[in-house]
């Protein structure tokens, strides 16, 4: 297998989840290697393992053993957005991004916004798939206007994309955009944050 995706626990690592969802959804063959996150200090097992591989000290990262990086090493692609773009270029026969130029630009815009924005939702609704966090979600929703603004912006963006594409996914067919917002769906679900009927589907 030439592609190796190194991830943290996808129950807690939203960025790992995004990359994993994308590769699985398009049936792209890869080995998935879990690095247990036991902390982020320099002496943690996580940092030690990641730094030994030569990445940036974060997950996910993708190694393509079929490509050299110019230093006689396998190519390492760090950061989820870079991984998405690398996969889109490498597997151009897969519709990683929408075919329509305008829709593709809008999808990239939203991925970039997700990449750098929605800080309140990330901060107060930590990624945690499984437990019922509805009581915590109710308090977060009550006490943090910034979270409410983030969710409102997400709902507006989703509604706009669905109106333009006709669904069933955000840009019509499944794309990187859906993989990017998959962890947001998990946060909305497990924290039971109020959303409209359209967002619930």
Regions found by a protein language model. Give the residues of each.
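GST-like domain detector, emphasizing the conserved glutathione-binding G-site
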Residues: 1-141
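GST-like fold's C-terminal all-alpha helical module
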Residues: 114, 118-201
């Amino acid at each position: 297998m030439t592609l190796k995706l190194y991830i943290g626990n996808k129950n807690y690592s939203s960025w790992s989840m995004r990359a994993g969802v994308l590769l699985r959804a398009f049936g792209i063959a890869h080995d998935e290697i879990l690095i247990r996150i036991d902390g982020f200090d320099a002496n943690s097992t996580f940092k030690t393992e990641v730094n030994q591989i030569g990445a940036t000290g974060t997950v996910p990262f993708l190694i393509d053993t079929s490509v050299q990086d110019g230093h006689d090493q396998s190519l390492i692609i760090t950061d989820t957005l870079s991984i998405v773009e690398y996969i889109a270029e490498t597997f151009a026969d897969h519709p990683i991004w929408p075919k329509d130029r305008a829709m593709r630009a809008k999808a990239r815009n939203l991925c970039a916004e997700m990449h750098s924005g929605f800080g309140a939702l990330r901060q107060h609704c930590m990624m945690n798939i499984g437990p019922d966090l509805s009581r915590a979600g109710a308090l977060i929703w009550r006490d943090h206007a910034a979270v409410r603004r983030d969710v409102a912006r997400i709902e507006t963006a989703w509604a706009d994309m669905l109106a333009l594409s006709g669904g069933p996914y955000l840009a019509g067919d499944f794309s990187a955009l859906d993989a990017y917002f998959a962890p947001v769906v998990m946060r909305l679900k497990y924290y039971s944050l109020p959303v409209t009927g359209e967002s619930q589907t």
